[in-house]
Amino acid sequence: MNILRIACRSFHCLRCGPLLNENRGWSSKKIIKLVNKSSLSNKEFTEKVRDGTKDIPEWKKQKMAVRKKLQGQRWNPPKKISQEQMEALRLLKFNFPELTASDLADRFKISPEAVRRILKSNWKRTDEENNNTYERWKRRGERIKEMYQRKEDADFVSNQIVTSRKIILGSNSNSPELIARNVRTFKPFKPNNSTPEKKNTNKLYILKHLGSKQ
């Protein structure tokens, strides 16, 4: 049974804001043309590209080489742990020698072979390296604190962006080209503060109001 896989992408057309210099938003045809131009189609991947035969950007050649190397598999690089986690792994193994490499691998979310390499390694950080790491993390914490203080004082840029249209693009497995599946138009919300407040005509409110006057 063939299962049709549809991949949809959403793009927002902004009529104002710092993201666009034009006064009006992009049309759906222009967005589709831009996405199709920057995408790597299946036809380009299946064809044999030789030097000098086709004018293909370098980034497309690299992407095709990576896809050919993976052979259709998902890119899943091995996980790396920090030096602090390595020290914690060695300390855990020293205190609990009955733990196997598989147990430690499940705990730290790495492969058992990586656990064996870490335990066999005799490398340790010196006192100077520990002090440098401490000072680096201290400076990083100060920068993060300053960044949050600036955000509290300044307005967010996202509040200045008005979204007027949302174009939903889609493609199927038979054709690599994208098509516009839906276009939604949003009206900006304008609070009307000039309208007078309506008087409450509830009977309980009127009786309470008359009782307070007496």
Curated annotation (Swiss-Prot):
Q: Into which family does the record put it?
A: Belongs to the RRG9 family.
Q: Which GO terms describe its biological process?
A: mitochondrial genome maintenance; mitochondrion organization
Keywords, alphabetical: Mitochondrion, Transit peptide
Q: Give the chief site where it resides.
A: mitochondrion
Q: Where is the transit peptide?
A: 1-18
- InterPro entries tied to this protein: NGRN/Rrg9
Full protein name: Required for respiratory growth protein 9, mitochondrial
Q: Classify the source by domain of life.
A: Eukaryota
**The UniProt record lists the keyword Transit peptide:** yes
Compartments annotated for it: namely: Mitochondrion
- Give the free-text miscellaneous remark of the entry: Present with 1160 molecules/cell in log phase SD medium.
Task: Give me the Gene Ontology terms describing cellular component.
Answer: mitochondrion; nucleus
The entry's function note states: Required for respiratory activity and maintenance and expression of the mitochondrial genome.
